[in-house]
């Protein structure tokens, strides 16, 4: 019997997430990340995009799960309060029991305001994630509006192929390059860089977790999915799961 059964946690340092979507546009208008649009919708400032916070968890999850995190990791998040430029955020993760493949994660501002809560796990057999549990509690919507022309299982018009290099501007949705992101990312790993990417366990530079949503959206227009608009989007929940990771720069 161990001396204590105290639940242990690990945390990172306070970081200042940076706003990089103030020039984001889609469907002919600016986004919630524009100061004026945010103010018009009643927000005190333009929120920093949710996946930006994911980078602060990567050092913690690499410590807990090792290289398996990069190869089969799943981060599943429910956002609680927005963060604006200048605010500090700290990421936390519970230390799971030996052999466990899932753990709790959360982030807080310096004053204790919760930013997000969720789970992180590794595969191939992922336990139920934060979003799995939340979806199980949902009731079917009686009347869809924005998504009324879409249905579960719908396929895009074409098979999409996307790649990210260090200097490539990622388009109107994400008007910056990977190198520009790396200059402002909260947790920079040498494994992300052109100079030292070959030092990663896979011998190549890997794409940061927070940039995976950028990559998947790069060709999203090709799918031809129709939604009613104009509409201004804001993430409430988000999940990213690696199947055969990591993803590499220039591939």
Regions found by a protein language model. Give the residues of each.
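Hot-dog-fold acyl-thioester-processing enzymes
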Residues: 2-72, 127-239, 245
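Short beta-strand edge segments in extracellular beta-sheet folds
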Residues: 121-125
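Hydrophobic beta-sheet segments that form the core/acyl-binding groove
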Residues: 69-119, 238-251
């Amino acid at each position: 019997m161990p001396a204590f059964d105290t639940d242990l946690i690990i945390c990172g340092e306070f970081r200042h997430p940076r706003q990089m979507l103030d020039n984001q546009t889609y469907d002919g208008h600016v986004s919630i990340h524009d100061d004026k649009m945010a103010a018009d919708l009643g927000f005190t400032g333009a929120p920093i995009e949710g996946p930006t916070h994911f980078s602060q968890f990567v050092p913690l999850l690499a410590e807990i799960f090792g290289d398996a995190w990069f190869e089969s990791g799943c981060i599943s998040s429910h956002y609680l309060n927005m963060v604006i430029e200048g605010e500090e955020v700290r990421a936390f993760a519970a230390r799971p029991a030996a052999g466990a493949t899932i753990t709790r994660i959360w982030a807080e501002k310096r004053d204790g305001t919760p930013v997000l809560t969720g789970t992180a796990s590794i595969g191939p057999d992922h336990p139920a994630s934060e979003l799995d549990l939340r979806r199980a509690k949902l009731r079917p919507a009686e009347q869809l509006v924005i998504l009324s022309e879409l249905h579960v299982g719908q396929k895009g018009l074409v098979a999409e192929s996307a790649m990210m290099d260090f200097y490539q501007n990622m388009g109107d949705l994400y008007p910056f390059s990977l190198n520009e992101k790396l200059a402002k990312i909260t947790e920079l790993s040498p494994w992300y860089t052109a100079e030292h990417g070959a030092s990663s366990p896979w011998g190549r530079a890997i794409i940061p977790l927070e940039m995976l949503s950028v990559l998947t959206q790069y060709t999203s227009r090709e799918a031809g999915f129709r939604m009613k608009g104009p509409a201004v989007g804001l993430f409430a929940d988000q999940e990213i799961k690696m199947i055969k990771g990591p993803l590499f720069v220039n591939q």
